[in-house]
Amino acid sequence: MTLDVATIRRDFPALASGTAYFDGPGGSQVPRQVAEAMAATMTSGLSNRGAVTAAERRADGVVMAARQAVGDLVGCDPGGVLFARSMTQATYDISRALAKEWSEGDEVVVTRVDHDANIRPWVQAAESVGAVARWVDFDRETAELTVDAVREQLSARTRVVAVTGASNVLGTRPDLPAIARAVHDAGALLYVDGVHLTPHAPVDVAELGADFFACSPYKFFGGHHGVVVAAPELLERIHPDKLLPAADDVPERFELGTLPYELLAGTTAAVDFIAGLASEAADRRTRVLESMRALEKYEDELFGKLLEGLRGIPGVRLYGDPERRTPTAFFTVAGHDNREVYEHLAAAGVNAPASSFYAIEASRWLGLGDGGAVRAGLAPYTNEDDVDRLLAGVAEVAR
């Protein structure tokens, strides 16, 4: 199966502006099917979830459909899908709930390649109970995060290891199954930030070995909220702070307040959109996997062109060269401030922003301080013309 990129692009109203969007790692553009699903849900007549009125049943149906959609997207039990305002908020909530069982001297492990949303919640939760945060470094040249580097930080006191599925700036994709085996051998839990991985590769949570897997629908064509999945039996053992009359069932006990039904409808529509990118299989899970494999192949080939072009521009420095990566380039141009590059590209209708993008530990570790670099990420709607325009803009700055 292959992607029909021209057809895909017609489903994205934002592309009519002529802008080349390389800012997908910060949030993708939205296809019309998702926007229509959200609008239809908001006007369909909803109430709080229940079983008496039609409005209550519609609300409940929206939630259950979204749980099933996420289950089909990442290969998990829908009963272990919980929704939150953002991945960051969900990670804070879960880290604090888990910390209730930690003791002074216990340890959590975090990595310098991660987004701060998968670092600070764990570090702060550890500090709150007298536990210790241990750090895993990555290779500055290749940006690889090795299993051995993680293993060196494990001990009998390790309670949680937090690691990215893919770096949101460098694209690094650690060997999660191998890391999971090491973490589980130490008797600890593995919390995977899959926000940047999920839009670019097929995901099977069980194969990855993740006890928790977090993602954000707005990175894969949906609305702005967060998702965490885990086995329902694991969630049953965790008791987050919640309101007294709120449901104590799993996963509802983790979902504070009324859920954003329109966003959940958008998530279901986004998964349906992904499933239809390059597959006509009978069941949605199979369609998702086939479409994501086709997407991964397309993005890898186009990203090769982008990397080759950037490497051929004098003064451009690319950071990291991991063996397995998402289509994400992090670069600087000698003699030019990152902001200057960003603004020059923006003036030409090419969106490739510059920042640390909350991967502040990675930015500092690379010697970039808090300012980071320019980031260019591909999406299914990115085409060769977009890449040519980006390369031309960078070359103009580098002259």
Descriptions of predicted regions:
Residues 1-399:
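Pyridoxal 5′-phosphate
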